[in-house]
Amino acid sequence: MKQLTLVKTVKGVGIGLHKGEPIEITLEPLEANSGIVFFRSDLNASYKASPENVINTQMATVLGDDRGFISTIEHLMSAINAYGIDNVRIVLNANEAPVMDGSSISFCMMLDEAGVKELDAPKKIMVIKKPIEVRDGNKFVRLTPTKEPRINYTIKFDNAVIGEQSYNFEFSKKNYIENIARARTFGFLKDVQALRSMNLALGGSLENTIVVDENRILNPEGLRFKDEFVRHKILDAIGDLTLLGYRVFGDYTSYAGSHHLNHLLTKEVLKDKDAYEIVSLEKTTQKAYEKVFA
C-alpha cells in the first residue's frame, strides 16, 4: 500500500468561523514523506501539522508560533484522514480555515475534485501497542490496541435537545462520508453574545452551525442526523488525532472529550515510545490493516 497525495491543485473560498471574513483555501500535492503542511500565504509562514505545533485548543485546534497561527483546522484534517491522504499542502490567506457548512463534507468534495494518486513510497500507520488515557474529572479520552479500529464516543449535556448521545464508528472512508462528514459543529444561543464580545464566532450563522436554545434547535431545516452532535465530535476527534502524522490503528474511546483532551492524548502517545509502533505497509504487512482504507 502506497502513500497518497492529490492528483491536482484545487481552490475554494469560505467564511472564517471566528473572524467572519472570506478566506481562500488551496490544496496542493506534495511529495512522499512530506506530511500535512499548512501555509499562511499572507505571512509566508509554514506550519507542519503536528502536536508540537499546537498552541491553543480552547474553541478549536490551533497551529502556530511567534509568526502567527492557523485556527479551526480539525474539519479539514478529518477529511484528509478519511481519504487516506499522507502528503498535502494547505494554503490559506488568513489565520483560520474556512468553516464551510460547519461539517467536513465541503472538504471531501474538494478532495474528490483534486483526485488522489499513489506515490512511490509505502504508507505508514501508527499502531497502538498499549492503552493510553487522559482524564479531567469524569471526562476522558483513551486509545487502546485493536485489530479493527473504532471510535466509541459519548457526550452528555445538561440540555433537553442534546442530552446524552453515544455513537460507535468503524473506520472506513465509505462509512465516514455516509455517517460522519455531514455532521455540523454546534453551539448554544446563550453563549453567542459572550463569544462575539471576545471577537469569536463572528462568522457563525445558521448556515454553518447548529444553534441550540434551551429546548429547541433554531436551524429551520433541523438536524441531518438525530445524533448529529456526537457524530460531529467524532469528526473533530479524527481531525485532532491526524496531527500524530499517521492514520492511528487503535480504538479511541471518549466520554465528554474535547480538543484539549485530544491534544493531551497525542502528546502522551508520543511521550511513550512503547505505546506505539510505526508500521510500513509493505505487501507482507498491509493485509491486516487495509480494511480501514476501504
UniProtKB/Swiss-Prot annotation:
Its EC number is 3.5.1.108. Zn(2+) binds at H75, H232, D236. Pfam families: LpxC. The keyword Hydrolase applies. Keywords: Hydrolase, Lipid A biosynthesis, Lipid biosynthesis, Lipid metabolism, Metal-binding, Zinc. One of its GO terms (biological process) is lipid A biosynthetic process. The keyword Protein biosynthesis does not apply. It catalyses: a UDP-3-O-[(3R)-3-hydroxyacyl]-N-acetyl-alpha-D-glucosamine + H2O = a UDP-3-O-[(3R)-3-hydroxyacyl]-alpha-D-glucosamine + acetate. It comes from the Bacteria. GO terms for cellular component: membrane. Its cofactor is Zn(2+). Pathway: Glycolipid biosynthesis; lipid IV(A) biosynthesis; lipid IV(A) from (3R)-3-hydroxytetradecanoyl-[acyl-carrier-protein] and UDP-N-acetyl-alpha-D-glucosamine: step 2/6. Belongs to the LpxC family. This is UDP-3-O-acyl-N-acetylglucosamine deacetylase. The lineage of its organism: Bacteria, Pseudomonadati, Campylobacterota, Epsilonproteobacteria, Campylobacterales. The gene is lpxC.
